[in-house]
């Protein structure tokens, strides 16, 4: 009932008089001083947009603010964000032709702050760029970002690994809503598809200050695609076929925007059979299917903007490599026939995400309040058709309140915030096993941060306090009650010139032990292990130093980003060396301290003699240091990713738009934990090309091949490594996308 009252309260506040301030401008090519038509113009604070006309002119209505950000995006030009005064009658923007760009330069979805002004290095990528070579899921797509890997269980389940850490240490947000989807399990996916998403931002390392406790590895922040331009409607449909799984993925989005109200509706479906191995056989029970629905409703007041978002997803996924037979061989999980219909063992996931995001603007201040809820239903079937082995419901009610003050104008900013989450975890009565008891968790956090910047320098510092109350119940009787608390701080600075950017930052993080680490005592069939918790575990504390040096020339960009992340009381799963009913037993243990260190290096070269040719390579290196033996498992090996892209003339009605060739070298991993096996190095070569047909409607055709050489390899982070199951073999794909 209280949630309904909050929503009604916010809705009443939003019914103020409409926006009255008119904003107009013109966009030019900076080199040739010619007007640019069809440039996308985004007003960042209100999420409104429009297009320039044939003369480069644009007009839209803006809120009555002292200042605001306007972002200009055009194909073939560098994205530009301008900070404009509220009384600016006419705005002139000059876009620089894009010769090279190591990473997408956007305004951070969390702070409405240009990344060039952010002391903390953020990797930002468009979803379209990450899927230039088709990806099976979002985990695979974002693993193409330096320092980010994926831990997968076949094709249907994948989650991000950031600088060697995963699971509960990675916080995922979608448009500011924290996503909780039982991410503690290695066999549980993200619950997020690419439907309606525009870009993703990754903060690597402890990021608890603004995003809450637990983010020791970092934050993965997904942003929706922008609304249609005011007065316009857009229809987008995409179909993707992949030969390796004989799989089809369908996406559909409808967008419409009026003066005060904008909305989006979307639906998607995917169905994939068992994936084919390089030897021509198939990975038994690696099939999966998914369905997703999405809606967005946005509306504006005189000095406010409001977004109501809802997403539903359902996934059915087989569990490959599952067995109780201790004498099973790798060949027993490879079959001659590819199948699509699900068989046991299998997992079923239902996810509901709903959020109501509100912003009110003052003369020199801004108030943002987000209220939301997430619901995750997980059902695992092992061998019994009618009785699930696990059946759990995870429900979260959360809020995020943030106040931004600019007492001395835009140079100085003070941010104060409150965050809270109430979580219920319940087991179904009909499940045969209970991995963890029923529980309730209450999180509360408060933070204060300040930022100061000028034309060259930007500095930021802040502090945060978190408290977590955790209660567990056995047969409705309280059996466990703990309170955890922690204080974190961060500070950083950035200095930028026309040719260089230097960043240095320090941040700390705090993570209370999760319910599964404390109280597990049962079979986790999806992960194929018997897990035993430790009720006396202490919280983890992390401290990271991070430096970024970025040098930019006319035809070359160099980036060097070393880091050290030291974690105290590191919690890990320790194999016990024996089985329980044919399933290996593991217990949660603690390491006094472990240091993760390494670097990301990037090079983007654009030769002067070939303006349409782009060569980009990134190298990611991660290692650990512990006071005793290495108890850190699943440490990502060194990785070298190289992309060669050639863009063709876009002035033709139909033609080849671009060609992409991508090569990945994954080094061998010899640094392993107790009872963990090493991994060999491998090379994977992918290629893709895109054709475009323009007119009243725009058609895009993409075709490509993944794993062109049909390389047989087993990724070190694969959850199927223990049964020697290789990754998918050669995969031809074709996608058709329609926009109008």
Stretches found by the model and what they are:
Residues 19-103, 163:
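Periplasm-facing N-terminal accessory domains of Gram-negative outer-membrane beta-barrel systems
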Residues 1-26, 41, 102, 740:
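Bacterial Sec-dependent N-terminal signal peptides
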Residues 35, 124, 173, 191, ...:
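Short aromatic/basic micro-patch
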Residues 99, 106-133, 140, 151-165, ...:
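Outer-membrane beta-barrel proteins, especially TonB-dependent receptors
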Residues 37-39, 68, 168-170, 365, ...:
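Short beta-strand/loop motifs in extracellular/secreted proteins, especially
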Residues 50, 148-151:
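A short linear hydrophobic-aromatic micro-motif
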Residues 43, 172-174:
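Conserved aromatic beta-strand anchor motif in extracellular beta-sandwich/beta-rich domains
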């Amino acid at each position: 009932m209280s949630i309904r009252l909050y929503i009604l309260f916010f809705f009443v506040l939003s019914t103020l008089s409409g926006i009255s301030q008119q904003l107009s401008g013109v966009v030019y090519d900076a080199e040739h001083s010619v007007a640019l038509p069809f440039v996308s113009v985004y007003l960042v604070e209100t999420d409104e947009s429009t297009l320039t006309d044939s003369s480069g002119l644009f007009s839209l209505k803006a809120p009555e603010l002292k200042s605001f950000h306007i972002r200009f995006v055009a194909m073939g030009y560098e994205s530009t964000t301008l900070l404009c005064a509220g009384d600016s009658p006419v705005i002139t923007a000059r876009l620089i032709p894009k010769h090279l760009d190591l990473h997408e330069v956007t305004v951070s979805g969390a702070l409405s702050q240009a990344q060039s002004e952010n002391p903390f290095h953020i990797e930002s990528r468009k979803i379209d760029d990450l899927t230039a070579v088709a990806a099976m899921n979002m985990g695979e797509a974002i693993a193409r970002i330096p320092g980010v890997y994926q831990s997968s269980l076949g094709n249907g389940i994948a989650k991000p690994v950031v600088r060697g850490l995963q699971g509960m240490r990675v916080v995922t947000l979608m448009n500011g809503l924290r996503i909780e989807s039982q991410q503690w399990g290695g066999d549980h996916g993200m619950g997020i598809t690419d439907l309606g998403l525009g870009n993703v931002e990754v903060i690597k390392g402890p990021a608890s200050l603004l995003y809450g406790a637990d983010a020791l590895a970092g934050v993965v922040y997904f942003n929706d695609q922008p609304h249609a331009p005011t007065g316009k409607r857009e229809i987008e449909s995409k179909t993707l076929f992949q030969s390796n799984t004989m799989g089809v993925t369908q996406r559909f989005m409808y967008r419409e925007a009026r003066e005060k109200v904008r909305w989006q509706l979307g639906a998607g479906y995917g169905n994939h059979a068992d994936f084919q191995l390089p030897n021509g056989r198939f990975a038994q029970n690696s099939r999966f299917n998914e369905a997703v629905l999405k809606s967005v409703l946005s509306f504006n007041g005189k000095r406010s903007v409001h977004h109501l978002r809802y997403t539903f997803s359902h996934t059915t996924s087989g569990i490959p490599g599952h067995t109780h037979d201790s004498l099973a061989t790798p060949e027993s999980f490879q079959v001659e026939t590819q199948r699509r219909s699900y068989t046991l063992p299998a997992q079923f996931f239902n996810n509901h995400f709903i959020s109501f995001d509100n912003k009110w603007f003052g003369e020199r201040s801004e108030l943002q309040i987000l209220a939301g809820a997430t619901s995750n239903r997980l059902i695992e079937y092992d061998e019994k058709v009618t009785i699930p082995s696990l059946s759990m419901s995870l429900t979260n009610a959360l809020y995020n309140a943030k106040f931004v003050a600019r007492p001395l104008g835009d140079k100085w900013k003070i941010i104060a915030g409150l965050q809270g989450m109430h979580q219920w975890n319940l087991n179904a009565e009909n499940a045969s096993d209970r991995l963890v008891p029923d529980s309730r968790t209450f999180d509360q956090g408060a933070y204060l941060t300040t930022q100061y910047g000028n034309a060259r320098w930007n500095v930021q510092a802040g502090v945060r306090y978190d408290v977590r109350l955790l209660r567990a119940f056995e047969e409705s009787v309280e059996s466990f009650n703990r309170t955890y608390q922690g204080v974190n701080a961060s500070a950083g600075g950035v200095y930028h010139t026309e040719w260089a950017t230097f960043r240095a930052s320090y941040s700390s993080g705090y993570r209370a032990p999760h319910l599964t680490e404390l109280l597990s005592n049962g079979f986790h069939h999806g992960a194929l292990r018997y897990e035993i918790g430790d009720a006396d575990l202490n919280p983890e504390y992390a401290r990271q130093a991070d430096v970024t040096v970025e040098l930019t020339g006319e035809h070359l960009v160099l980036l060097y980003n070393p880091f050290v992340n030291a974690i105290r009381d590191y919690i890990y799963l320790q194999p016990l060396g024996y089985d329980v009913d044919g399933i290996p037993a593991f217990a949660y243990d603690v390491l006094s301290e472990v240091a993760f260190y390494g670097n990301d290096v990037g090079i983007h070269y654009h030769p002067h003699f070939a303006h349409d040719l782009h060569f980009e390579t990134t190298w990611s290196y991660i290692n650990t240091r512990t006071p005793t033996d290495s108890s850190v498992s699943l440490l990502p090996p060194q990785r070298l990713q190289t992309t060669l892209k050639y863009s063709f003339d876009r002035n033709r009605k139909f033609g080849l738009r671009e060609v992409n060739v991508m090569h990945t070298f994954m080094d061998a991993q010899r640094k392993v934990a107790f009872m963990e096996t090493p991994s060999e190095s491998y090379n994977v070569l992918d290629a893709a090309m895109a054709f475009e047909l323009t007119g009243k409607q725009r058609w895009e055709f993409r075709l490509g091949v993944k794993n062109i050489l049909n390389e047989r390899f087993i990724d070190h982070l694969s959850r199927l490594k223990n049964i020697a199951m290789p990754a998918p073999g050669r995969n031809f794909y074709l996608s058709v996308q329609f926009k109008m």
